[in-house]
């Protein structure tokens, strides 16, 4: 079915779809786990990527989730924009009044931070982006240290280049490696040095969405495959960047 934009949609009607497979797919996605469904040439569905000749495999990925820890206009502006974009957003705020403002904006998950030594339990997953906007050294170090031990695909912290360099140095003095602190993005945003809270929110959210789409499209982009082969005039070891395939 061609579309005016130049794309197309293929429609496949399965009159006797296995409801159990669809329920299992839904439940796995609801638990924040990626899942695949395989459609055989006979029209039957199977859960998972099944190596069946002629079959097609469709992968479904958990939606982007955003966790923001901070205070002030930067945190609220980003949370408001992300929520309006349909992104599941969690706010961790130090100020009780700001927490009430966030709830009035329609943000359901709002936690008030008390002391750096008693952080909320980490529940990030590989589809979670974390942004720090605290502007306090003690809180900054503790929150980033917690995020770094988790699986979030994006960790960002608001601040200048000099501020970012200092925060990474502090984290390294408490045991994190340079490779680990390299996960932290700073300064954040596609457009550098944004001062207005709303403009900064647009810049940061665009960077987060870009990182999420890159993870979805190229899930093995950071994985390497070492191929050892005895081939004349070719070095023994070659390093290839892995890619994904949608055909079963």
Residue ranges and their predicted role:
Residues 1-111, 125-129, 207-248:
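Segments forming oxygen-rich coordination pockets for charged ligands
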Residues 100-103, 140, 164, 197:
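Alpha-helix N-cap/helix-start motif
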Residues 19, 116-119, 189-195:
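A short acidic, often aromatic-flanked loop/helix-cap motif at beta-alpha or helix-coil junctions
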Residues 152, 158-248:
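Adenosine-phosphate binding glycine-rich loop
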Residues 18, 75, 137-140, 164, ...:
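Alpha-helix N-cap/loop-to-helix initiation residues
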Residues 111-173, 201, 209:
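Phosphate-bearing ligand-interacting subdomains
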Residues 33, 87, 151-152, 176:
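Residue-level recognition of short, well-ordered coil/turn positions
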């Amino acid at each position: 079915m061609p579309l005016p934009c130049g794309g197309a949609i293929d429609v496949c009607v399965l009159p006797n779809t296995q409801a159990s497979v669809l329920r299992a797919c839904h439940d796995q996605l609801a638990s924040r786990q990626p899942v695949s469904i395989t459609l055989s040439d006979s029209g039957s569905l199977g859960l998972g990527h099944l190596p069946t000749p002629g079959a097609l495999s469709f992968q479904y990925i958990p939606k982007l989730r955003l966790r923001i820890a901070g205070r002030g206009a930067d945190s609220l502006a980003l949370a408001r924009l992300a929520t309006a974009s349909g992104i599941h957003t969690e706010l961790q705020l130090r100020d009780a009044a700001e927490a009430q403002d966030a709830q009035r904006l329609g943000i359901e998950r709002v936690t008030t931070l008390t002391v750096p030594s008693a952080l909320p339990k980490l529940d990030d997953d590989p589809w979670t982006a974390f942004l720090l906007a605290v502007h306090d050294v003690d809180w900054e170090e503790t929150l980033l240290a917690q995020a770094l031990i988790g699986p979030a695909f994006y960790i960002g912290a608001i601040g200048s280049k000099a501020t970012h360099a200092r925060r990474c140095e502090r984290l390294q003095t408490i045991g994190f490696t340079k490779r680990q602190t390299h996960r932290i993005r700073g300064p954040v945003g596609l457009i550098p040095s944004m001062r207005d809270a709303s403009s900064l929110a647009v810049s940061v959210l665009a960077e987060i969405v870009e990182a999420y789409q890159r993870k979805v499209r190229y899930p093995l982009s950071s994985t390497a495959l070492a191929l050892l082969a005895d081939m004349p005039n070719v070095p023994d070891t070659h390093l290839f960047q892995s890619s994904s395939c949608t055909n079963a």
